[in-house]
Amino acid sequence: VPLARQFDWVWALLIWATPAVIGVVIWIYLGKAEKEENARKEREEPINKEVKPIFSDNTRIWKSGLAWQMATFMALQSFVFYVTLSWLPEILHSNGFSESSAGWMLSFMQIIGLPASFLIPILADRLKDQRKIVIGIIIGMLFGFSTLLFGHSAIMMVVATAIIGLAVNGNFALALTFFGLRARTAKDASSLSGMAQSLGYLFSALGPVIIGAVYDVTGSWTTPLIIVLVTIVLLLFMGLLVGRDRYVLD
């Protein structure tokens, strides 16, 4: 919103497109380099005529209870994450912030969450049991969204936004870290990641739509925020299961 008002929506959207263009250029370069490296290895290594099975043993991942818990955790945390990105400015606007200020607050939330995105995976990797991290993150989420629901002062809204930024970004990073922590091999981690992220993002994509529809029906952010708080409580239960020291396919 701030950039759109200063320039127009075209330039505001182009700013977001810039990192994507840079990413595509890097991806093309790395893809060519990898292709050349694979070709070199094929020339140097003897041909392996061993026939590999069509279906991997890791299809067992779909029968793993821990894998389904991971998928549910991923779905719930992504639901909260994308609802926050989509509707936080509107919620702040309804609490007295101008459209421009609410837009800047969303940027503030994402920037202040960067340290958590870097530090949470490091901390989680040093611990065998990550349940205390989950509890800390959930407390932050509950405080932040409860403040959005019941708070009225601008200062409290800023504090809530900061805490939400730390919590949701930290939780997103923790969810991705769990794929490596809950698998004994890279192959298992890949299978777990593919399953959990596919199902998780499929569900979470409905989050902003559902919350927006509820707001349209009720005309208030009270019920949508209650739905988010209930989702966070469910996320706590899933996090306590996933955070235990164990491995998928064991």
What are these regions (language model features)?
Residues 5-18, 211-232:
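A membrane-interface helix-boundary motif in multi-pass transporters
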